[in-house]
């Protein structure tokens, strides 16, 4: 029954890891990251859970004759913020899954 003991130990380790990852995910909810575009003319703030929290657009970014530029800036800033949130998530959760081959992590 030696294999059973190893399995129990592995299950305990997995439960411990799940608990730590759950705690990290809760912390991520409170984290904020920003993406900017146009030299800071547009700033998007998202949570660690990739929820858009704020969009700031400086007055000089608004040109009624070139709405497409503003749209592009908002998209670029949002994408940058989302990428930073992904990196933060990977950094925080990755330390708990090192060495494990878990799809999506």
UniProtKB/Swiss-Prot annotation:
Xref: Gene3D superfamilies: Nucleoid-associated protein YbaB-like domain
Listed transmembrane segments: none
GO cellular component terms, A-Z: bacterial nucleoid; cytosol
Keyword Ribosomal protein tagged: no
Assembly, per entry: Homodimer.
NCBIfam families registered for this protein in UniProt: DNA_YbaB_EbfC
Family: Belongs to the YbaB/EbfC family.
Entry protein name: Nucleoid-associated protein SSP2277
């Amino acid at each position: 029954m030696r294999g059973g003991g190893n399995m129990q130990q592995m299950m305990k380790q997995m439960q411990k890891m799940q608990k730590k990852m759950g705690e990290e995910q809760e912390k991520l909810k409170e984290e904020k990251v920003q993406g900017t575009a146009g030299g800071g003319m547009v700033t998007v703030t998202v949570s660690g859970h990739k929820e858009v929290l704020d969009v700031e657009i400086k007055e000089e970014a608004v040109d009624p004759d070139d709405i497409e530029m503003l749209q592009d800036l908002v998209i670029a800033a949002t994408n940058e913020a989302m990428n930073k949130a992904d990196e933060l998530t990977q950094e925080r959760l990755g330390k708990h899954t090192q060495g494990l081959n878990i799809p999506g992590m």
